[in-house]
Design a protein with these regions (language model features):
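Acidic, metal-coordinating catalytic segment for phosphate/diphosphate chemistry
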Residues: 1-30, 36
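A structural signal for short, well-ordered beta-strand segments
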Residues: 31, 91, 109-111
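Short, charged/polar surface micro-motifs in flexible loops or helix N-caps
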Residues: 34-39, 48-49, 65, 112-120
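Conserved Nudix-box catalytic region and its N-terminal flanking loop in Nudix hydrolases
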Residues: 39-80
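A short coil-to-beta-strand element that immediately follows conserved catalytic motifs
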Residues: 85-93
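Active-site-adjacent beta-strand/loop module that shapes the phosphate/pyrophosphate-binding cleft
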Residues: 97-122, 136
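Nudix hydrolase/Nudix homology domain
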Residues: 120, 126-179
Length: 179
């Protein structure tokens, strides 16, 4: 059953790289995924590209395809990156942030989702070869620690600033409202 909660709306800037304009906006869906045993699911990114050598934690998700509804996109992305089928419980909020290095404005739509079943992932070639995505199953405290570790890197700080408030709000919702 989908419920509605007060959503977080955040507008963040990229303090890591100089702003040189924006060439494109990207609609993105992301999720805090949890299971009935109290674990949260994330992806570990291991990359070496224009953003530098970096290993950090991030929520699963990705770009919304043209004409695609947000909730359809979140189901597709979670199946691809985590191999999970989910129940979407609620929208947590929207975080607007920037990747100045690639002149992109991100509109991140976050959902709270309960894992129903876990199956095979369907990663793209870039997700396998460039970002080396792997699945992490963590407790809430372990996830917080992973995000804090990521603060050592420029891209990790951007991700942490965007996602820690969302993770904390998801935990509040789970602790307060969800059976």
């Amino acid at each position: 059953m989908k419920k509605e909660f007060e959503q977080i709306i955040l507008n963040l800037s990229d303090e890591e790289w100089e702003f040189n304009g924006v060439t494109h906006d990207r609609q993105i869906v992301r999720a805090i995924v949890f299971d009935d045993e109290g674990y949260f699911y994330f992806v570990r990114v291991d990359r070496d590209d224009d953003f530098g050598r970096a290993v950090y934690i991030e929520t699963a998700g990705g770009g919304v395809e043209s004409e695609e509804e947000l909730e359809i996109a979140i189901h597709r992305e979670l199946k691809e990156e985590l191999g999970v089928s989910v129940e979407v419980l609620c929208k947590i909020g929207v975080v607007s942030d920037y990747y100045n290095l690639i002149k992109r404005h991100n509109i991140n739509n976050y959902y709270l989702c309960r894992a129903i079943s876990v199956g095979e992932k369907h990663l793209t070639e870039d997700e396998i070869n460039q970002y080396h995505l792997s699945t992490l199953k963590l407790t809430y405290d372990e996830a917080i620690a992973e995000y804090e570790k990521g603060r050592e890197l420029p891209i990790g700080r951007i991700v942490c600033n965007r996602e820690l408030p969302i993770l904390k709000r998801a935990k509040e919702i789970l602790d307060t409202y969800i059976e």
